[in-house]
């Protein structure tokens, strides 16, 4: 049985960390994404996305067979959700715009959905009316099914123009009020879905929108969606397609920035970045040069893949050496667009892994990454790199966020950074009472410890300027459905999606409320007891 490494000594201030330890202009917020929270899949003129097709066609590949048809109904409860953000005293709220809600047919030529425009205008206006800054993601993986049908989505160069047009429409409609944009969320994760993960879209790239019948919304989220019989081959993908998708994501990002800087920058004065996922790639044997090199190579395949082109217009050397002609070249004009196409870097960090150049002895769980020629594992000599948050994948390693920030500073010219996602999940235990379900000590500890390491990185010169918890509320998790909960706010999936603050939400409010900008030991005024009452629902 695996044991766990002892918890490292936390940097000061450790468990007492709060807003006063950070500069006044440091941004604290929480994030969500459209498909995971909005629901209203067939309301307001929205068209289907690849996730709609996938979850209805392959419910067996979602852990509980559910889908995002209703998600957590934020489309209809957005004012309540914004009230929560205000009660918590957060500076900012990160959300994504649903491409098929704005452009149901995917392209401008197929028509603009004014109801979708109105929804996001209302959301943005409500945020600003409550002194909350919007941070808006343009693409959080919900490709319009229409574009997947027409030309296989991001497998085709054609999507670059359609994404540019979608982005331009968003700048035109919302850019007078939105000053902080994230073009693409986790392009590495999305690209890898083509060749690594068989159980996610765009596995469904061969499925046509005509097969997305309009089923009745699932009444109880734990029940699977209806299954529609089909003889269509869902299709498989090659490893080369992973890099083609990544290439087009980078070009789409650059095209969106070009249209903004050419047409909107002078009047709107917005800032841009991509949200890139990272892990601490810890050498299995730090005294073995081959393992150290393998860990560096793993970081390139995870983070450098999308960061290096923004610096030099080239992919990381280790990727070029490993992949050769399988990795496409950028043209001279494309390099010009890519270099410097960011104002800040979004960093999504959750966990860490060991990396080795050879298969670790007596480790049957080690995963070999063929293209990068390295192994990853969460275990060394029978000891886990960090405790597991649940049954899979998220080992809790707070030091890892510090190590990643230091590596980004050293390798990529010390860019301005926002932690755009950081959080931990608990398993959705349906046997717990509401009061029990809202006790999330693991999350409080996780956030305290990671924020302490973020502060340490800042004190050592890393230019971190903001931190967003993932996520504001429990939501429909991609692949996991309703089986895991990432939220500061508990959502009752079975009783009209009622929202209740967890212990972590109350802790975060008391430690990081915007009123605490001046004094380390100051607490927010208890102006709204409803939030601090442990068993009271947050009202509309």
From Swiss-Prot:
Entry keyword Protein transport: no
Keyword Secreted set for record: no
Catalytic residues of the enzyme: 186 (proton donor), 421 (nucleophile)
Subcellular location as annotated: Cytoplasm, Cytosol
Site (Controls the gate shape and acceptance of substrates) residue list: 393
The family this protein is said to belong to: Belongs to the glycosyl hydrolase 1 family.
InterPro entries in alphabetical order: Glyco_hydro_1, Glyco_hydro_1_N_CS, Glycoside_hydrolase_SF
Encoding gene (name): GLU9
Stated role: Beta-glucosidase catalyzing deglucosylation on N-deacetylisoipecoside and N-deacetylipecoside.
Source organism (scientific name): Carapichea ipecacuanha (Ipecac)
Lineage: Eukaryota, Viridiplantae, Streptophyta, Embryophyta, Tracheophyta
Name assigned to this protein: Ipecac alkaloid beta-glucosidase 9
First-tier enzyme category under EC: hydrolase
Binding site residues for a beta-D-glucoside: 36, 140, 185-186, 350, 421, 470, 486
């Amino acid at each position: 049985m695996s044991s766990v490494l002892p918890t490292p000594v936390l940097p000061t201030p450790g468990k007492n960390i709060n807003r006063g330890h950070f500069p006044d202009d440091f941004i604290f917020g929480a994030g969500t994404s459209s498909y995971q929270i909005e629901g209203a899949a067939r309301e307001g003129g929205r068209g289907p996305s690849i996730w709609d097709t996938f979850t209805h066609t392959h419910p067996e590949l979602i852990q509980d067979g559910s889908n995002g048809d209703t998600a957590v109904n934020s489309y209809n409860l957005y004012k309540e959700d914004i009230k929560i953000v205000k009660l918590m005293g957060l500076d900012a709220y990160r959300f994504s715009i649903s491409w098929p809600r704005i452009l149901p047919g995917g392209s401008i030529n197929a028509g603009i959905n004014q109801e979708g425009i109105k929804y996001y205008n209302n959301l943005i206006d409500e945020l600003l009316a409550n002194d909350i800054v919007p941070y808006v993601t343009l693409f959080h993986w919900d490709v319009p099914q229409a574009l997947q049908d027409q030309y296989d989505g991001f497998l085709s160069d054609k999507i670059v123009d359609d994404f540019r047009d979608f982005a331009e429409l968003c700048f035109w409609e919302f850019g007078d009020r939105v000053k902080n944009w994230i073009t693409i969320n986790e392009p590495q994760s999305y690209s890898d879905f083509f060749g690594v993960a068989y159980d996610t879209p765009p596995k469904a790239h061969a499925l046509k929108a005509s097969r997305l019948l309009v089923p009745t919304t699932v009444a109880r989220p734990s029940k699977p969606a209806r299954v529609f019989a089909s003889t269509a081959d869902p299709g498989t993908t090659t490893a080369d397609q992973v890099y083609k998708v990544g290439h087009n994501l980078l070009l789409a990002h650059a095209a969106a920035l070009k249209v903004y800087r050419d047409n909107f920058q002078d009047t709107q004065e917005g800032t841009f970045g991509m949200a890139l996922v990272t892990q601490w790639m810890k050498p299995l044997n730090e005294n073995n040069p081959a393992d150290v090199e393998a860990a560096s190579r793993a970081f390139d395949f995870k983070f450098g893949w999308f960061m290096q082109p923004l610096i030099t217009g080239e992919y990381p050397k280790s990727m070029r050496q490993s992949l050769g002609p399988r990795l496409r070249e950028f043209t001279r004009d494309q390099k010009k667009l890519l270099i410097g196409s960011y104002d800040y870097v979004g960093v999504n960090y959750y966990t860490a892994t060991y990396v080795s150049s050879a298969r670790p002895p007596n480790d049957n769980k080690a995963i070999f990454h063929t293209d990068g020629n390295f192994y990853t594992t969460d275990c060394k000599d029978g000891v886990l790199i960090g405790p597991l948050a649940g049954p899979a994948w998220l080992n809790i390693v707070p030091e890892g966020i510090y190590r990643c920030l230091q590596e980004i500073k050293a390798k990529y010219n010390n860019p301005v950074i926002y932690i755009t996602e950081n959080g931990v999940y608990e398993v959705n235990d349906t046997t717990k009472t509401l009061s029990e379900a809202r006790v999330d000590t693991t999350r409080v500890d996780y956030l305290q410890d990671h924020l302490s390491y973020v502060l340490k990185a800042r004190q050592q010169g890393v230019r971190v300027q903001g931190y967003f918890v993932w996520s504001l509320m429990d939501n429909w998790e991609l692949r996991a459905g309703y089986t895991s909960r990432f939220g500061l706010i508990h959502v009752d999936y079975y009783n009209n999606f009622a929202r209740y603050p967890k212990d972590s939400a109350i802790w975060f409010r008391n430690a990081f409320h915007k009123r605490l900008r001046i004094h380390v030991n100051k607490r927010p005024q208890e102006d709204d007891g409803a939030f601090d009452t442990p068993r009271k629902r947050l009202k509309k």
